Amino acid sequence: KEGAIGLVILAVLILLVMPMFLDIFRLNLMGKYLTFAFVAIGLVLCWGHGGILSLGQGIFFGIGGYCMAMFLKLEASDMQSTAAQTTPGIPDFMDWNQITSLPGFWEPFHSFGFTLFAIIIIPILLAFIIGFAMFTRRVGDVYFSIIMQAIVAILTILIIGQQGFTGGINGITDLKTLHGWDI
């Protein structure tokens, strides 16, 4: 137990000290490594300890990331920076797809508080619904993996097919700031 506490203290110290000594490129790279480490830990818990191979754990990670990207894109799509568009104030990919107003499901993402809430709650709710449906029917072994892969395919087709609302295959790009801080 003392070893675990020591590791936590060391990790916190490293995370507090690293921003002081690393340039922005290395700091962003370290952030990406830590983010992907969380995904890997989720796979280890699911497959390594639970014995359930999930080929779709990335959808929950991706949905959380997409929620943050929606907030960042709305922040980057203010009236000044989008003045050259046909419809100023909406994300550029929506303007390119002739969408003239911000869709209703994008509106709450103007709020950073809602975005942080959505990053956690939306993937949890989706995982609960999928898990409840599959585990109450005692789906296991390879069938769990096949169903998860099918859900990934469905979401991929949905996201790419709704390019005007989601950014399609390119996703949400050109994210520059978070509350005025360069990212």
Predicted regions located by residue number:
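Transmembrane alpha-helices and adjacent helix-loop boundaries
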Residues: 1-183
